[in-house]
């Protein structure tokens, strides 16, 4: 009964994960899949609003506890699956041998180790010490000099962000991962990638073992024979589903590394791309207060040029002749991402030891 419940919850969570990750992609626009995703997000917002209300009533402690439900639930599900695999599937493998036993147990240990490392490692809390060796500077396009976090009241270095869940600012912020209840940033991105790779290894290798365990058995009899066949067949189906989702998500992060952006920065670059699409982003010479780019706006019927940093008016119609304005027509051709040093160098930077 417990195993059946876990399987059902696993299937539901995998479908929900797929909807959240890919339901808004252009391929699914104006389809039932996007509508399901929007409904899921709407329900999630209502639930989170209730959580925040109840959390306030309990002096901010409830949400901290609830944040651990997903990683604890993940570890519990994985542990039960491991137990079922060792009990039912492993005996079906003829003469597994020492090497195969080693790889099986190593894969299991790697799951626990990577989860612990990703969940409890420092993502990159901002201190005066680590700022001295922090390599990134503002590009004056999506990150600017002199920015201060309105919550922490500390200086915000380039590529950092405040996490509302952890209530802290982190260097090279990527995203807050619910599966580990931790932010992914400057110091622990390597453990996050290890977490993903260890899951891909578990799903791929585990699925392969389940397939070979079932090979001598007629597929028509899998669901109608003994419990071991049923468990192994279910594992094969689950591994086949989850490895696709996990692999796609991992390749998505590899694509971000290739582009030289983080998940957080992708949204910022999307805003820049939107301004370019509207034809209102300009490069200026000479720069004003170290700002090299401005946005054209209309004030009282006249064109003005405002700061991307704080939306102050930097250039009025009366003094526009003092500056050289060049319209940015393409993000790819006219703008340079100073944080992109090529895929291999980007990867080395992200997997910082």
Swiss-Prot record:
- Mind listing the GO biological process terms from this record? protein targeting to membrane
Keyword Acyltransferase listed? The answer is yes
Residues passing through the membrane, by range: 2-22, 62-82, 101-121, 191-211, 234-254
Q: Which residues lie on this side of the membrane: Cytoplasmic?
A: 23-61, 122-190, 255-353
UniProt xrefs under InterPro entries:
Palmitoyltrfase_DHHC (IPR001594), PFA4/ZDH16/20/ERF2-like (IPR039859)
What sequence ranges are listed for the domain DHHC? 147-197
Report a single Gene Ontology molecular function.
protein-cysteine S-palmitoyltransferase activity
Q: What does this protein do?
A: Palmitoyltransferase that targets several endosomal SNAREs. Palmitoylates the SNAREs at cysteine residues close to the cytoplasmic end of their transmembrane domain. May have a role in the cellular quality control of transmembrane domain-containing proteins.
Name the catalytic site residues.
177
Q: Which GO terms describe its cellular component?
A: endoplasmic reticulum; endoplasmic reticulum membrane; Golgi apparatus
Mind telling me what this protein is named? Palmitoyltransferase SWF1
Query: Keyword set for this entry?
Result: Acyltransferase, Endoplasmic reticulum, Lipoprotein, Membrane, Palmitate, Transferase, Transmembrane, Transmembrane helix
Reactions catalysed according to its record: L-cysteinyl-[protein] + hexadecanoyl-CoA = S-hexadecanoyl-L-cysteinyl-[protein] + CoA
Q: Name one Pfam family in it.
A: DHHC
What membrane topology was assigned to this protein in its record? Multi-pass membrane protein
* Residues exposed to the Lumenal side: 1, 83-100, 212-233
């Amino acid at each position: 009964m417990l195993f059946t419940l876990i399987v059902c919850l696993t299937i539901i969570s995998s479908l929900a994960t797929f909807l959240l990750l890919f339901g808004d992609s252009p391929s699914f626009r104006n389809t039932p899949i996007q509508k399901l995703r929007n409904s899921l997000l709407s329900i999630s917002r209502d639930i989170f609003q209730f959580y925040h209300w109840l959390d306030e009533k309990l002096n901010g402690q409830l949400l901290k506890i609830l944040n651990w439900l997903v990683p604890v639930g993940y570890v519990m599900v994985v542990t039960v699956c491991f137990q079922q695999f060792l009990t039912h599937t492993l005996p079906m493998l003829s003469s597994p041998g020492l090497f195969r036993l080693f790889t099986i147990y190593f894969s299991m240990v790697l799951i626990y180790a990577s989860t612990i490392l990703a969940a409890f490692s420092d993502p990159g809390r901002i201190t005066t010490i680590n700022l001295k060796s922090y390599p990134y500077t503002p590009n004056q396009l999506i990150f600017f000099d002199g920015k201060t976090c309105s919550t922490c009241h500390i200086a915000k270095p380039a590529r950092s962000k405040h996490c509302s869940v952890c209530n802290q600012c982190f260097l090279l912020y990527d995203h807050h991962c619910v599966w580990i209840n931790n932010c992914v940033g400057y110091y622990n991105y390597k453990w996050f990638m290890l977490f993903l790779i260890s899951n891909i290894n578990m799903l791929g290798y585990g699925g392969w073992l389940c397939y070979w365990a079932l090979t001598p058995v007629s597929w028509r009899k899998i669901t109608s024979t003994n419990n071991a066949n049923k468990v192994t067949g279910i594992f094969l189906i689950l591994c086949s589903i989850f490895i696709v989702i996990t692999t796609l998500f991992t390749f998505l992060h590899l694509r971000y590394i290739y582009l030289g952006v983080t998940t957080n920065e992708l949204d910022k670059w999307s805003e820049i791309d939107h301004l370019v699409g509207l034809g209102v982003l300009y490069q200026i010479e000479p720069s004003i207060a170290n700002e090299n780019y401005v946005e054209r706006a209309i004030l009282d019927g006249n064109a003005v040029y405002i700061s991307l940093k704080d939306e102050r008016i930097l250039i009025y119609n009366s003094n526009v002749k003092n500056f050289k304005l060049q319209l940015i027509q393409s993000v790819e051709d006219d703008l340079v991402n100073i944080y992109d040093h090529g895929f291999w160098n980007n990867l080395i930077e992200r997997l910082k030891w």
